[in-house]
C-alpha cells in the first residue's frame, strides 16, 4: 500500500480520488457489469420468447386470452418463471454490488483483484448483504416517516454498510452499527459529502434524461411529423442520447461504490489510525537504508 493512500483526505480529495479510482478500475467493473447484464438480458429474452410463443399459438389474437385452455397454461408458465426470474435478479444484483465494492477496496489497499475469487467471496456474503439491505430499507423508511428530510441523514449513516461487510466481515446487524459508528465520528462532514456527491451525480443524470426524453418530444411537437429529415434527426438523436445515458448510468453506479469505499477508509484513517501497522513495517524496512546513508 502506498503511504500517500494513508493520508486523510478532505472532500475535494475524496471527489478527485473517486473519479481516478473509478476510471483506473473501469475494465474490471465492465467485466462484472457484463456478467450482470448478461444474466438480466438472458432472462428477459427467455420470458419474451415464451410470451411470443403463446401469441403465435393464439394467432396473435388478444381475445384468445379469455379462453381457459390458453390463459391457464400461460399463467401456470409465466408466474413461476417470473418468480424464479425475480429471485435470480435479486441474487445477481447483490453479487454485482458486492463485487463492485470489492474491486475498489482491493484497489485502495493495493491488493490484486480476481473475478473468480471475488465472486466466491461475495457469494459467501450473500445473506449478510441481503439481510443488511432489508434492515437498511426499514431504517430509511423510518427516516422518511419521522421527516422527509430524515432520509438523507439515514442514508449517510448506513452508507458504509457494504464496505464494512466486504472488508471487516461483519454480519448484517453488526455492519449497520459499525457504519453508524464510523459515520458518527464526523457525521456532518460525511452527511455534507454524501449530499454533495448525490447532487453532482443526479444533476448529470437529469441532463441526460432531459436530452433523452424531453428534447426529442419537443422537436417532434414543433415539426408535427411532416419533415422526414427531422424525423431521422430525432431518431438518431434519441438513440445517441439513450446510449450516453445508459453509459452514464453504468458509470454512476461505479462512482457511488468508489465514493463510499473512500469515505469508509478515510474515516478509519482519520479516527482509528488505520494503516499504522503498515507504516511501522515500512519504516522498519527502510531503516537499514537510512543507516547506510549516514
Label the model's feature ranges.
Residues 95-124:
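Hydrophobic transmembrane alpha-helix segments characteristic of membrane transport
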Residues 2-5, 13, 17, 58-65, ...:
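Juxtamembrane transition segments at transmembrane-helix termini in multipass membrane proteins
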Residues 32-55, 77-97, 130-155, 193-220, ...:
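Hydrophobic alpha-helical transmembrane segments in multi-pass membrane proteins
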Residues 5-83:
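N-terminal start-of-domain structural block
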Residues 74-75, 79, 111, 126, ...:
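Membrane-helix interface segments
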Residues 51, 55-75, 114-137, 141, ...:
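Long, highly hydrophobic alpha-helical transmembrane signal-anchor segments
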Residues 6-8, 12-42, 115-142, 156-207:
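Interfacial aromatic "cap" segments that immediately flank transmembrane helices
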Amino acid at each position: 500500500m502506498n503511504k500517500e493512500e494513508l493520508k486523510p483526505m478532505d472532500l475535494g480529495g475524496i471527489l478527485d480520488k473517486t473519479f481516478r479510482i473509478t476510471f483506473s478500475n473501469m475494465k474490471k467493473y465492465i467485466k462484472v457489469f457484463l456478467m450482470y447484464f448478461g444474466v438480466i438480458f438472458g432472462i428477459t429474452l427467455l420470458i419474451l420468447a415464451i410470451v411470443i410463443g403463446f401469441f403465435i399459438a393464439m394467432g396473435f389474437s388478444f381475445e384468445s386470452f379469455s379462453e381457459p385452455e390458453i390463459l391457464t397454461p400461460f399463467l401456470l408458465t409465466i408466474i413461476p418463471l417470473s418468480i424464479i426470474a425475480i429471485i435470480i435478479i435479486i441474487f445477481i444484483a447483490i453479487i454485482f454490488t458486492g463485487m463492485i465494492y470489492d474491486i475498489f477496496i482491493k484497489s485502495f489497499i493495493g491488493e490484486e483483484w480476481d473475478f473468480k475469487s471475488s465472486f466466491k467471496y461475495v457469494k459467501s456474503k450473500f445473506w449478510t448483504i441481503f439481510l443488511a439491505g432489508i434492515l437498511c430499507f426499514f431504517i430509511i423508511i423510518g427516516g422518511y416517516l419521522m421527516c422527509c428530510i430524515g432520509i438523507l441523514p439515514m442514508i449517510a449513516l448506513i452508507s458504509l454498510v457494504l464496505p464494512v461487510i466486504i472488508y471487516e466481515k461483519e454480519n448484517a446487524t453488526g455492519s449497520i452499527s459499525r457504519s453508524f459508528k464510523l459515520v458518527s465520528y464526523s457525521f456532518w462532514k460525511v452527511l455534507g459529502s454524501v449530499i454533495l456527491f448525490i447532487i453532482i451525480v443526479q444533476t448529470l443524470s437529469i441532463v441526460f434524461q432531459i436530452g433523452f426524453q424531453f428534447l426529442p418530444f419537443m422537436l417532434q411537437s414543433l415539426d408535427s411529423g411532416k419533415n422526414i429529415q427531422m424525423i431521422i434527426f430525432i431518431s438518431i438523436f434519441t438513440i445517441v442520447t439513450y446510449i450516453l445515458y445508459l453509459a452514464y448510468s453504468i458509470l454512476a453506479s461505479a462512482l457511488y461504490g468508489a465514493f463510499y469505499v473512500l469515505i469508509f477508509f478515510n474515516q478509519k484513517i482519520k479516527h482509528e489510525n488505520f494503516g499504522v501497522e503498515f507504516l511501522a513495517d515500512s519504516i522498519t524496512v527502510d531503516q537499514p537504508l537510512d543507516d547506510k546513508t549516514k
